[in-house]
Structure formats: C-alpha cells, structure tokens
C-alpha cells in the first residue's frame, strides 16, 4: 500500500505517519482516527492479522471500540482472535477467515495449517460466519458448515465472472477492486 518493505510492527508510529498511501498525499490513519472519520456512517469489517498466539491487539482495539456506536464485525484467520471476542465481547459478530492453507508450498506437511483449513477450531470459537477463499469453495468443512446453517461468505471477488461463478456456493461476498 505504501511501497515500503517490512511489516507494520517494524516501524514506529511516527515513521508510519510519514508514509504515503498508493502514491497519494494521504497518510496512514491511526485506528482511532479511522473510527472518528467513519463515525458510524458505514459498517466496517475489522480484520485482525495475528502472526503469533497472543491477543493484545484485540484488547487494545476493543478499548477503542467499546463505546463505538456504529456497526462493525471482526474477522481473522487466527482462531485466537475469535476466541478472545467470544469470551470478552460475545455480542460482536465474529467471522473465521479461511482457505486451504495446506495447498500452499510453504505450509505443506504442516499439521496446524491443515486443521486450520478444515475449520477444526470452530468448535471452540463458534464464529457467526465463515469467510472462505472462493477458489476453495469445494472444501468439505466449509460445505458442511453451510449445510448446518452457518453464514457462508467469500473473499475476495475481483470480477463479475467470479461473482456469478460463486453465487450458489456463498451467501455474502467481499469484493476487492471490482466494478460490477
């Protein structure tokens, strides 16, 4: 988004605020600034990107969200984020992001990534919806969850053709850079 190498946590807030978004004059807003700008005008999805088994970011964001009056939901690939919200903020809509990780070369042979692909942790996290990569719509666990009544969402649809191809497999769609 900014043409800079590294992860967000590699930089200080001051360094991040100097970076420009997509070759524009816009800078990266803090989450607090984002909430003030949105101010309940539109619903939003907050995706937690946990790269380790700790939920401090959930606690910090929740402090800013607990008095927010607008509509939002959270989603994450990491089941611990959903588990944290189930325990501390059960009224917040939770979504499990998923795909068939075991198909990726870097995860081949990983037991953890295989069980994540098959939504095994849903027993504990009890997500309100499952957001599965549309390229893996045939995943048996995703299909079972849908048959059992789980709201089935897909990401990220980038064309009208992808949307049409997936209409029967999913209930809701997350679009990215798409004009229908």
Residue map of PLM features:
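An active-site metal/cofactor-coordinating segment within enzyme catalytic domains
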Residues: 1-40, 49, 92-112, 116-117, ...
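Surface-exposed cleft-lining segments at the edges of enzyme active sites
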Residues: 20-23, 47-51, 63-72, 128-129
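Structural preference for beta-strand elements that scaffold enzyme active sites
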Residues: 43-45, 71-75, 91-95, 128-131, ...
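Helix N-cap/beta->alpha junction signal
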Residues: 50, 78-79, 134, 159
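Distinct, well-ordered alpha-helical segments
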Residues: 54-65, 81-92, 106-113
């Amino acid at each position: 988004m900014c043409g800079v190498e590294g992860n967000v946590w590699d930089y200080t807030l001051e360094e991040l605020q100097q970076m420009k978004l997509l070759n524009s004059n816009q800078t990266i807003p803090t989450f607090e600034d984002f909430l003030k700008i949105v101010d309940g005008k539109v619903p939003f999805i907050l995706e937690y990107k946990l790269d380790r088994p700790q939920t401090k970011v959930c606690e910090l964001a929740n402090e800013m969200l607990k008095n927010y009056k607008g509509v939002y939901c959270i989603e994450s690939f990491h089941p611990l984020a959903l588990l944290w919200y189930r325990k501390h903020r059960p009224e917040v809509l939770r979504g499990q992001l998923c795909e068939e990780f075991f198909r990726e070369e870097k995860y081949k042979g990983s037991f953890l990534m295989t069980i994540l692909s098959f939504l095994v942790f849903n027993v504990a996290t009890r997500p309100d919806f499952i957001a599965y990569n549309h390229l893996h719509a045939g995943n048996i666990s995703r299909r079972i969850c849908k048959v059992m009544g789980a709201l089935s969402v897909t990401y990220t649809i980038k064309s009208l053709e992808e949307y049409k191809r997936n209409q029967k497999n999913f209930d809701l769609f997350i679009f990215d850079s798409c004009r229908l």
